[in-house]
Curated annotation (Swiss-Prot):
Name this polypeptide is given: Large ribosomal subunit protein bL20
Region (Disordered): 1-29
Cellular component terms (Gene Ontology): ribonucleoprotein complex; ribosome
Family, per entry: Belongs to the bacterial ribosomal protein bL20 family.
Amino acid sequence: MARVKRSVNAHKKRRSVLKASKGYRGQRSRLYRKAKEQQLHSLNYAYRDRRARKGEFRKLWISRINAAARANDITYNRLIQGLKAAGVEVDRKNLADIAITDPAAFTALVDVARAALPEDVSAPSGEAA
C-alpha cells in the first residue's frame, strides 16, 4: 500500500479554519486547536440562534402592539380577541408595523376589535365600549 502524505490537505484544512476564525479574541484566532473548537461552538450558536430569532421577533411585535393598544385604551389580549371575533386576519408582524407607521389605521383596527368584543363583566372598567 502506498504511503499517504497529508501535508497539503492538512495545511489547507488548517488555513480554512484559521481564516474562518478571523475576528475571534486571543488564541482563538491564532492557534488551530483553539480556533477549531471555537468554530464548532460558533456554528452551534448560529444554528440555535437562527431558531431563537423567530421567537424574539414575535416578542418584539407583541410588545409594540401592546404599547400601541394601551395608548388606545385596550389591552393586547382584548385587541387580539376582538380582531379574531371580527374576522380580521392580520398577523402580528404587520399589525406591529401598522401600529408604528400608521397610527390612524391602527386606531381603526382597534375600533373594529372593540365592536366585535362581547360586552362581559370580566372586562376591565376602562375598556367597555
